[in-house]
Structure formats: C-alpha cells, structure tokens
Regions:
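Glycine-rich flavin
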Residues: 29-144
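N-terminal glycine-rich anion-binding loops that anchor highly charged ligand groups
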Residues: 18-26
Length: 144
C-alpha cells in the first residue's frame, strides 16, 4: 500500500520536526539526568509544562484524534496521524508535550466517540486541554 502525504500533513510534520529540533532534542540529556535522580520520581522538570504550552500555542496539540471525531481534533486520517507519531515518537517522553500520550490518548478517543455530553464536558474537555490526567484499569471476569 502506498501512501502519499497531503500538503497539509507534510507541513504539519515539518512544523512538528522543527519544534522537536528546537525544544525536544536539545533537552534529552536534561531529561535523562532528571529522571535518573530518584528524588524526582513521579515529577517532571520545570520546563516540561512550558514546552506543553508552546506546543499548544503552535497548534501541535491533540494531533491524534482522526477526522471522524469531528471538532475534537485536527481531522487527520489515521494514516496521516501515523506519520505525525513517527516524528513525535523519536523521543520517548515527547508525546505528553503534545498531549498525545497513553493512557490519556486512548481515554480521550473513547470519550470522544462514546461519551455522553455530560461525560465529555466533565472529562473529555479537561483532558483535551491538558488540565487533568486519566487512568485505565481492567480486570478479568470473576476476579475483582
């Protein structure tokens, strides 16, 4: 199967790569040093939220929601999103900068597709804004 990226996706991917070059790649050593310090467990560096705000301001936010989810995302096709994620995933901690990380991403997809208006208001909108985090839990029948 061949895939020819649209001009929009090529431009978006170039914008994402430029952001990665300017803000993400230069911080890889800082990130590693920060995470190796056990005192920082479950923390993020001070600059992390600054980068999230920059990504949001540059329109590099919630890029994962495909066209069938309507106004919640940029309206890309799944095959287009794959190209974006290929770039984003070059650094293992980059996806949260763009609000495209698990488990939030999957939970937002479920809420966008199946959530009631009330659930979307209470949970989806704050997740899309990056104001809250989510979790995913699963058990087996007759276990819990």
């Amino acid at each position: 199967m061949g895939f020819q990226a649209s001009e929009r996706v090529v431009a978006l991917n170039a914008q994402l790569e430029a952001f990665m070059q300017e803000h993400i790649y230069p911080r890889e050593h800082e990130w590693e040093a920060f995470t190796l310090d056990q005192n920082n467990r479950w923390q993020v560096p001070d600059w992390f939220d600054v980068l999230r705000e920059k990504a949001k301001a540059e329109g590099l936010w919630n890029l994962f929601l495909p066209e069938e989810y309507g106004d919640w995302g940029p309206g890309l096709k799944n095959v287009e999103i794959a190209r974006i994620f290929e770039t984003m995933s070059k650094v293992n901690w980059a996806q949260p900068i763009f609000n495209c990380n698990a488990p939030d991403r999957g939970n937002m997809e479920v809420l966008a597709k199946y959530g009631t208006a009330e659930q979307q208001e209470q949970w989806l909108k704050p997740l899309l804004a990056g104001d809250i985090r989510s979790a995913y839990a699963m058990t087996e029948p007759q276990v819990a």
